[in-house]
Swiss-Prot record:
GO terms classed as biological process: protein ubiquitination; response to bacterium; response to heat; response to temperature stimulus; response to virus
Protein name (record): Heat shock 70 kDa protein 4
Subunit and interaction comment: Interacts with CHIP. Interacts with HSFA1A/HSF1.
Keyword Nucleus among record annotations: yes
Organism lineage string: Eukaryota, Viridiplantae, Streptophyta, Embryophyta, Tracheophyta
Signals that turn on the gene: Induced by heat shock and cold. Induced by high light treatment and oxidative stress. Up-regulated by viral infection. Induced by infection with the bacterial pathogen Pseudomonas syringae. Induced by abscisic acid (ABA), salt stress, osmotic shock, brassinosteroid, cytokinin and auxin.
Superkingdom, natural source: Eukaryota
Phenotype of gene-disrupted mutants: Abnormal embryogenesis. Defective seedlings with high levels of reactive oxygen species and monoubiquitinated LHCB4 precursors. No visible phenotype under normal growth conditions.
Function: In cooperation with other chaperones, Hsp70s are key components that facilitate folding of de novo synthesized proteins, assist translocation of precursor proteins into organelles, and are responsible for degradation of damaged protein under stress conditions. ATP-dependent molecular chaperone that assists folding of unfolded or misfolded proteins under stress conditions. Mediates plastid precursor degradation to prevent cytosolic precursor accumulation, together with the E3 ubiquitin-protein ligase CHIP. In cooperation with other chaperones, Hsp70s are key components that facilitate folding of de novo synthesized proteins, assist translocation of precursor proteins into organelles, and are responsible for degradation of damaged protein under stress conditions.
Amino acid sequence: MAGKGEGPAIGIDLGTTYSCVGVWQHDRVEIIANDQGNRTTPSYVAFTDSERLIGDAAKNQVAMNPTNTVFDAKRLIGRRYSDPSVQADKSHWPFKVVSGPGEKPMIVVNHKGEEKQFSAEEISSMVLIKMREIAEAFLGSPVKNAVVTVPAYFNDSQRQATKDAGVISGLNVMRIINEPTAAAIAYGLDKKASSVGEKNVLIFDLGGGTFDVSLLTIEEGIFEVKATAGDTHLGGEDFDNRMVNHFVQEFKRKNKKDITGNPRALRRLRTACERAKRTLSSTAQTTIEIDSLFEGIDFYTTITRARFEELNMDLFRKCMEPVEKCLRDAKMDKSSVHDVVLVGGSTRIPKVQQLLQDFFNGKELCKSINPDEAVAYGAAVQAAILSGEGNEKVQDLLLLDVTPLSLGLETAGGVMTVLIPRNTTIPTKKEQIFSTYSDNQPGVLIQVYEGERARTKDNNLLGKFELSGIPPAPRGVPQITVCFDIDANGILNVSAEDKTTGQKNKITITNDKGRLSKEEIEKMVQEAEKYKAEDEEHKKKVDAKNALENYAYNMRNTIKDEKIASKLDAADKKKIEDAIDQAIEWLDGNQLAEADEFEDKMKELESLCNPIIARMYQGAGPDMGGAGGMDDDTPAGGSGGAGPKIEEVD
């Protein structure tokens, strides 16, 4: 529970391509805009020669710096380097990914002139820090507690890794909840007043990078997830890619040139395509104009909504398959679905809406909640509930989540014996008794798997441990109780106990899956602090540089001013001019100097200019006509000017 004085708890939708943050305030959810005024923030982190950028600033410079701009960290989090999906993704990314210790994928970038490696958790933690800062700027107070969302499809290790990212960012992650569940909460709150009896709601979440379909029942504020399905690799980016490929071909036809080898050209084209896609959701055609795209050739073209739909038709149709699977899993007919809820920016595409509406025989779709914000909205509500913030309005909302995959262990012959079937409401606990397979067997190997296949080799091994010290006995005699226990965050504990001897062993499914150790997390928390300090150091530097620049240019303008120039002694004027020229020249050559160097230069310049200007004012006598008022735009002596206050400001 959130202690008092920790500020309100926030809800964060940590997305593959964009993230969003909300907070419960004044009896409602507030989705918070960032410093650029955007209510969603790109999940991008960029490293440059001089600084680290997160969010819009990172995404905006991606064309200039593609190899050191990291995005899609969510596609790596909690996975192994050898995972086929990591290998497939790797080929599409401009940044480099290598295998680190324990097969953990590490992202390689150049930062401040040296090579650095970051895990997906660290990159995600930087995005989380950004989201937290956005909330803190809005609330005006520190934020410690958060609810963070993940796709329903995420397995145990991906959930753990997301939690770790929270820890590294300095947040207390009160709970990890499924994105569709969060959207359902947002929706349930909207609809609560009118609802009577049980409602079946299908949540169709087509985001930038992932696609989730979930079926929930909502009754009197109780949400239950009946089934989930989806595709971890389908989303807005895929639609962008289709358009990019289309235009790459067009460029080839028109200009006989292939731009695929040029990351910057591709990136500029992709940015234009993303913009065009958004436009085509509200207009029938749009133009793309990119100056000097490749080898000085301008690329001007148009695309119609019909053409965009044709390029993506197979993908749009593919979106309907998980809908059918979800209904099958929940043993429900599509006519029993009361509401179909759209989540994720890509659900704005008219064709997607039309296909979905046709599938549900013309049923109206729920679009009352901004699809980009629904998940963060629900997370913010959940955060309010968990921290006891909200009023009666939210307190009686209860949330039942489910396991996305069946959990079980391997029994003789490589058979998957399921203890917890998929779509079981969590938290949950199941026990089952097993025995030995051969006479006098001294121990058993408990191998924990997740997956839907009958044989363990086709499923995903979560972890294993041994229970030894079983006294000699004929096969089938010893009784070994195996217990599977999943908590509210979907984190699994498996224990085994030999009934006769009381021998016990257990595993928390975390470490064997590339989970970060305590030490690693500690180290990363310190790194995060270090980067924050560096970022602040950099800001200090920039501020000091700007102060010096402003002072020099203001002073130059001051002495150009007729009224003032006429009062200046020629030698003094020359002295000031030379000093300013020298300062500006020094600035040009030392853009990356340290803050104190800028400050020293500033003091030098001031100690020369200020006395001269002050003398001029005193010499002018009372009849100079409001000389006092000149303070506003002249860098006057002492503390009147913008300059000397630097140390006090920081």
